UniProtKB/Swiss-Prot annotation:
Stated family: Belongs to the YPP1 family.
Subcellular location: Cytoplasmic granule; Cell membrane
Annotated SUPFAM superfamilies: TPR-like
Coiled coil: none
Gene Ontology cellular component list: plasma membrane
Protein encoded by which gene: YPP1
Protein name: Cargo-transport protein YPP1
Membrane topology of this protein: Peripheral membrane protein
GO biological process: endocytosis
Function description: Involved in endocytosis.
Keyword annotations from UniProtKB, A to Z: Cell membrane, Endocytosis, Membrane
Domain of life: Eukaryota
Length: 719
């Protein structure tokens, strides 16, 4: 075994521990054992808090049974384990005996030694700013997650009000502390540029300049809404004084996000190219976690393609490979796709370094968001795979991430699993997470035909929200949106459980609630048209119109259509055309109804409602008669269409077009794929074409989604 292999395996083990891994397979078995004990100490401190004291006491016994340590690195790790365990067991004096020791050379493993040093400083407490006066301190790699963990923890306790930084590392302290300003950072950046020059062929880029760009990146992240224009010139000047700098390219990517998205993407492309060239030369990436974070940033920022250099689907594919590479390289457990659904509620409690966990979890979540509207990614379980790993790599999963997971289970029609997850993982810990209560009620409506459970949940949530509102609770934008849709779900339940008249009686309460919640028109739900307050109000009118239409209340139907249209003139809502189409169809005006549905399909060929509306006209229910309007509709050529003539239907261009549109819908649209009526009409079309195999498949899917149909679509609880 060569010395090079030994060093490489030890280096890899130390790198693995720095990123937060728990698996070590170096040529030094005792080192692996010490690193494992170090991981377990962190795990018991941060994860298994309920059994922390007993677990740490047991771990201490294991450390004491180790053989006599002579190697400097071994001794340093053991001292840190003793120190942090004694401190966590409230035996501070014993702990200080270990963490107060001066760290030796640790056999030249400087990056790992830096982490041990910071760990000792943190547990020693009362850190003196003078500790960081030496110019030997440098900004750690982002892959050195434990180093960042302790550095950020120490910074929180430092008084930097009178600190005068002289090195990039010291400027990083000031930046992370929130005390750095654009003016003083720019002043230092100018002095750096003066002593920087483009490197010769045998030279590297200016190290200090490269380090300062890491400072700038943190500054841009913290102040992303207020980026100073002056930084652009510094970035351009830095490019002129460096060769294929990954750090400068990342600064440019971050800077141009708000200024010029295309340039941001171009710099991301440069960053990736430089990283790949580095890999070709060195057989490793300079900082794999940093590269992963850059992918996460750009995919969460840009959802649209910029041909030919940026295609989100291709970038996502490369991103997934990088994520899997980092998991494999550092033996970080990954939930395989085929097992993601089987153990959907059972994820491991990992104790990664906090910065590592943040990058990995947000990366998996970004992959989910990027594919959220992809039907293939839903069907092949890619989405649940992404969400499962986002949850597993998160140190403390947010309620929003947990809700995404629960919502996705509901989307997959894993109703029992979703209910169990909501109750155990969300509502027990977050009893005021109204979206989860709403989702729970919708799930219960799938499996309880009498709807009593759903009705009790909805009424209880509405009562709770009303009380909180009356007490002065300031609801968030998404909570206001949720409140309205919970109220609409209540109306739907009343209509289904009791009578249409009862639902109509409490309909005015929805409009009153809207006025109370959205009295301040200057507070929009979001930047998109479908996130505007007006759009939500139109949704309410659309719901009201459906009730009036069912009640055959022509006067109120017309009034609701007018109110819907008069809400705003800023944009045309295709939902108005849909509503108009169904009103016309209900009253026998098939030709005019067809025109409305066609108008919607012109703008959105995957509109489920428009296609169903058109299908109602082209393929009327067997008990219905074809009306005169339909027979003379030149748009869909129905002159030769007769009720009992399968042959004429088969040759009808209208039926052929419907077949094409429905098949395209179930190939592309998640909503279309999961709508029972879509499969019902497809089965009728396949019957016309004598395709019994596909007819049976369509009927099977129709039954599946009809049986697990919630009282309102799940999308109405997902803001």
């Amino acid at each position: 075994m060569t010395r090079g292999y030994i060093d490489d395996s030890v280096n890899h083990a130390l790198d693995s521990r720095l990123i937060g891994s728990s698996v070590f397979q170096s040529s030094d078995a005792l080192l692996d054992q010490l690193l494992s004990l170090h991981y377990r100490a962190h795990y018991h401190i941060n994860i298994s808090t309920k059994t922390k004291f007993s677990a740490l006491s047991a771990l201490l016994s294991e450390v004491e049974k180790l053989p006599v340590l002579k190697d400097e690195l071994h001794c340093a790790i053991a001292d840190n384990i003793y120190g942090i365990v004694f401190c966590e067991l409230d035996e501070k004096e014993k702990g200080l005996q270990y963490v107060s020791k001066k760290l030796g050379s640790v056999n030249g493993y400087d990056r790992f030694g830096r982490m041990l040093d910071l760990e000792r400083l943190f547990y020693k407490g009362n850190v003196d700013l003078a500790e960081f006066s030496s110019e030997s301190w440098t900004i750690p790699k982002y892959s050195d997650g434990l180093t960042w963990h302790y550095l950020q923890a120490i910074i929180k306790g430092l008084d930097l009000s009178h600190f005068k930084p002289k090195t990039p590392f010291q400027w990083m302290l000031l930046t992370l502390n929130g005390s750095a300003t654009d003016s003083n950072l720019l002043s230092y950046s100018h002095s750096l540029l003066k002593k920087s020059r483009f490197p010769n062929a045998d030279e590297s880029n200016n190290f200090e300049l490269e380090q300062f760009h890491m400072v700038l990146q943190e500054h841009l992240k913290i102040n992303n809404l207020n980026v100073k224009k002056e930084w652009e010139q510094f970035i351009i000047d830095s490019m002129e004084k460096s060769f294929q700098s990954i750090s400068v390219a990342k600064s440019a990517m971050l800077f141009y996000r708000k200024v010029d998205l295309k340039r941001s993407i171009l710099n991301f492309t440069n960053l990736v190219n430089y990283s790949n060239k580095y890999y070709e030369l060195n057989k490793r990436y300079p900082d794999l976690l940093d590269l992963v974070s850059s992918y996460q940033f750009i995919l969460s920022t840009c959802k649209t393609p910029f041909e030919p250099f940026f295609m989100p689907a291709n970038v996502s594919s490369d991103f997934l490979k990088l994520l899997e590479r980092i998991h494999n390289k550092y033996s970080i457990p990954i939930i395989e796709k085929q097992k993601a659904l089987e153990g959907s509620s059972d994820v491991l409690d990992l104790c990664l370094a906090s910065s590592t966990a943040s990058v990995l979890s947000s990366s998996w979540e970004t992959l989910y968001e990027t594919s959220a509207s992809s039907l293939p990614a839903l069907v092949d379980h890619s989405q649940i795979f992404y969400l499962s790993n986002s949850l597993q790599t998160s140190l403390n999963a947010s309620v929003s991430l947990k809700f995404k997971f629960a919502y996705h289970l509901a989307t997959l029609r894993q109703i029992d699993q979703c209910i169990a997850y909501l109750k155990k993982q969300i509502l027990t810990l977050h009893p005021e997470h109204f979206a989860s209560w709403h989702l729970l009620a919708l799930c219960e409506s799938c499996i309880n035909e009498d709807l009593q459970v759903s009705f009790k949940i909805i009424n209880s949530v509405i009562q709770s929200m009303c009380e909180l509102f009356d007490e002065g609770r300031q609801f968030t934008i998404d909570e206001k949106w949720q409140f309205i849709h919970i109220k609409l779900t209540q109306l739907q339940l009343v209509r289904d459980m009791f009578a249409l008249e009862d639902a109509l009686e409490i309909l005015p309460e929805v409009f009153e609630l809207y006025q109370r919640l959205f009295s301040d028109a200057s507070e929009p739900l979001g930047p998109q048209i479908n996130q505007s307050n007006d759009y939500l109000l139109q949704k309410i009118w659309l719901f009201a119109l459906e009730l009036y239409l069912e009640n055959d209340d022509i006067e109120n139907v017309k009034a609701a259509l007018d109110e819907f249209k008069n809400v705003t003139s800023k944009y045309v809502n295709l939902n108005h055309n849909l509503a108009q189409g169904f009103v016309l169809y209900t009253h026998g005006h098939s030709e005019k109804a067809t025109a409305e549905f066609e108008k919607v399909l012109h703008y959105d060929s995957t509109s489920v409602e428009a296609l169903i509306g058109l299908a109602k006209i082209v393929l009327p229910d067997e008990e219905a008669n074809l009306d005169t309007d339909l027979k003379h509709n030149s748009k869909i050529n129905q002159k030769e269409l007769h009720r009992n003539s399968a042959t004429s239907l088969e040759t009808s261009s209208a039926v052929a077009r419907l077949k094409f549109l429905f098949e395209e819908l179930v190939d592309k649209s998640i909503e279309g794929y999961q709508t029972s009526a879509v499969w019902w009409y497809l089965s009728k079309i396949y019957e016309i074409y004598s395709d019994s195999t596909r007819q049976q498949e369509a009927l099977w899917r129709c039954i599946k989604y009809e049986e697990l149909q919630p009282v309102r679509e799940f999308k109405f609880c997902n803001f």
